Structures are given as structure tokens and as C-alpha cells.
Regions:
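Preference for protein termini
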Residues: 1-32, 66-77, 131, 173-179, ...
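Phosphate-binding site of ATP-dependent enzymes
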Residues: 177-254, 258-259, 269-277
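ATP-binding N-terminal substructure of ATP-dependent carboxylate-amine bond-forming enzymes
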Residues: 1-102, 136
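ATP-dependent carboxylate activation and anion-phosphoryl transfer catalytic cores
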Residues: 68, 234-237, 241-336
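Active-site nucleotide/adenylate-binding loops and adjacent lid/helix of ATP-dependent enzymes
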Residues: 106-203, 232
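Short, charged, surface-exposed secondary-structure boundary motifs
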Residues: 40-42, 58-60, 105-112, 161-163, ...
């Protein structure tokens, strides 16, 4: 019997390291990636390189899983590719984790605009905004709302903080090139840059939320939260990890709404009055999932062992704990 983690984010390594000591010796751990990433795949018992083409990859995964008696396939970053083929995996006796239980929920999670609309309809506090598709629309939306709100912008489709910028008027236009990690850009420079694109991607202009930011990593099963760790992201770059917090209760409502399944991550931020608003749910493990191990609550093990129908070992958890992310390195072998 085996468990297979397909290509994910960089946190695929953290998941493999969390799983290996918790699996019985007769459960083989497999990993794969489209690129040569030995620092990730060497953490598994067996590793493969995935085909580049999506359609080819799905059939290759299904065939390979059957050949090696793999009972659980975790789709990683490409849940939308595998979800339409769930019935084929189930027919082969293989459990499939994609982040949700149907393709439409995955598509709605991927669209910040549709995600916000569904949350609003369900009465869930969410960071909503205005979709723009060209420079003229962007300029009009900014002009209509800049007096009432500090504004920010991000792609309608994207993961985590990719493409997020705050719109600031009283700022040197060149500052965004000197300190890009500040994520601040002059309003006019952004409008000019967006207008210059021949095929601009849809963007979401939103009121900027100035309050505390949280991230919640969760084990979910068909819309039910099984275990969760909330991470309070502090200004000094440290994070406070908690097993109990009101933002987890907020996350439960969103998970139920979108029938989340597997390990997913919710991001939220407070407004000036302290009210938390959901920013997004990423239907895959976050880049910070490895930090949660400092609580001794092994989310990866809980997720996989429950799927395999195996008992969960007792975990001597700690909460709250404070961590600070570091940059480190590992030796890797060269490609053959």
C-alpha cells in the first residue's frame, strides 16, 4: 500500500517530512514533480518525474498508482486538473485529494471575485471589491472610490499574495522598484502600467484592510474542519501559532460553504475596527504549513492517516507558540 504526493508548492517537502515518521513501515511514501527537485522528492521512499502535459499526467498518475497499489493520491497544486477524473480514481480504489469535492467549488475558490460573491451571499464577512479588465475601468474605479477607501489591487486569479499591491498617492514612483517587498506603488504608475498591457489580466480593486492578518491551515473532509492551526502574522515577521482562535470558527464557515477537502489554507485580515474579513482560501497546503509542526499537531499525518482508516497517535500539542521563519539550505544531488 502507498501514499503519493504529486507536485505541490515548496511545502511539498514539509509535508513529506511530516508524514514519513508517522506512517507504518508497510506504507510506502511516493513523491513526484515535473521538474528535477531532489530536495523535495528525496524525502519520499520512491520518486518519479511527472509528464509535463496535463492530460497525459492524469492518465499516467492513475495507471502508475494502480501498478504500485497506491491507495491515496494527493493532487498538490493541480487539483482542478484531477478533480474531473475523480470517478476513475474511485473506481480503481484510490482516494483522491484535490482541495474540494467538485470542480465548480475549485473554480470558484480560484476566482477572487466569485469567491467573495458566494461568501457575501452566505453572510460571511469577506474582502470584496470591483473587477477591472482594462486601464480605463481601473482608472474609473480608483476615481470613484479613492476618497472613501485606501485601495489595493490583486489578480482575480492567483495564489497567496501573488500580484498584490497597495495604491499610494504620496509616494515616489520609483520606490516600488527599490523596495518591492513593501508591495506599495503609486496609483498613476499602476494605472499607466496596466493600461500599457495588450492583454491585461482581470484584476480586483479592493479597500485596503489595515488590521491584523491571520492564516489558518486546516485538515478538512467534505466541508468539515477536522484539525486547524491559526497563525497570527506579526509586523516583526514572527508568527504566533494557536490551536484555538475565533478566526478558526470563521474558517469553518468558509470550508463548509465550499466543501473543502484535504489540507487547505484560509487568509483573513481585520478592518480598522478589528472585524476579520476573509481574503481567500487556497485549495492546497500553504507555504507555511511546516511552521505548524511547532505546535506538535501534525496536520499532514492527521489528514493521511484518517484517509487510510488508521488510528491517529496521541500528539502532545503546544499552544500558543511563537515562531520566526528562516531561510536555510540543503545539499542536493545533480541530475543524471
Amino acid at each position: 500500500m502507498g501514499v503519493w504526493l504529486l507536485e505541490g508548492q515548496s511545502s511539498q517537502r514539509d509535508l513529506l517530512q511530516a508524514l514519513r515518521p508517522m506512517l507504518p513501515p508497510d506504507i510506502a511514501l511516493y513523491a513526484s514533480h515535473r521538474k528535477f527537485r531532489p530536495e523535495i522528492t528525496d524525502c519520499a521512499d520512491h520518486a518519479w518525474q511527472e509528464p509535463a502535459d496535463d492530460a497525459e499526467r492524469v492518465h499516467w498518475v492513475l495507471d502508475t498508482a494502480q501498478q504500485h497499489q497506491i491507495k491515496l493520491v494527493w493532487a498538490g497544486r493541480r487539483g482542478q486538473v484531477y478533480e474531473p477524473h475523480r470517478a476513475a480514481f474511485v473506481a480503481a480504489g484510490i482516494d483522491l485529494i484535490t482541495g474540494a469535492t467538485c470542480l465548480q467549488d475549485l473554480l470558484d475558490l480560484d476566482s477572487k471575485a466569485i469567491f467573495a460573491e458566494r461568501c457575501e451571499q452566505a453572510g460571511i464577512p469577506v474582502a470584496s471589491g470591483w473587477v477591472v479588465e482594462n486601464g480605463v475601468q481601473l482608472a474609473e474605479v480608483v476615481a470613484a472610490h479613492r476618497e472613501q477607501h485606501a485601495l489595493c489591487i490583486k489578480p482575480v486569479h492567483g495564489i497567496f499574495g501573488e500580484g498584490f499591491w497597495r495604491l499610494i498617492d504620496d509616494l515616489s514612483p520609483f520606490r516600488c522598484f527599490l523596495t518591492p517587498d513593501d508591495r506599495r506603488v503609486t496609483t498613476q504608475l499602476l494605472i499607466d502600467s496596466y493600461s500599457a498591457q495588450t492583454e491585461p489580466k482581470p484584476m480586483l480593486v479592493m479597500p485596503y484592510l489595515s488590521g491584523q492578518e491571520y492564516s489558518v491551515d486546516m485538515v478538512c473532509e467534505a466541508g468539515q474542519v477536522i484539525a486547524a492551526v491559526a497563525r497570527d502574522k506579526r509586523e516583526d515577521k514572527s508568527q504566533c501559532l494557536m490551536l484555538e482562535h475565533e478566526v478558526i470558527e470563521l474558517a469553518r464557515r468558509v470550508v463548509a460553504l465550499f466543501n473543502c477537502d484535504g489540507i487547505v489554507n484560509l487568509q483573513s485580515k481585520a478592518d480598522a475596527h478589528g472585524q476579520q474579513h476573509v481574503l481567500e482560501i487556497n485549495a492546497r497546503p500553504s507555504g507555511g504549513i511546516g511552521y505548524t509542526m511547532h505546535t506538535s499537531l501534525n496536520l499532514a499525518a492527521i489528514c493521511v492517516l484518517r484517509r487510510l482508516g488508521m488510528p491517529i497517535p496521541e500528539m502532545q500539542t503546544q499552544s500558543p507558540v511563537i515562531v520566526r521563519p528562516l531561510t536555510s539550505s540543503v545539499l542536493i544531488r545533480e541530475a543524471l
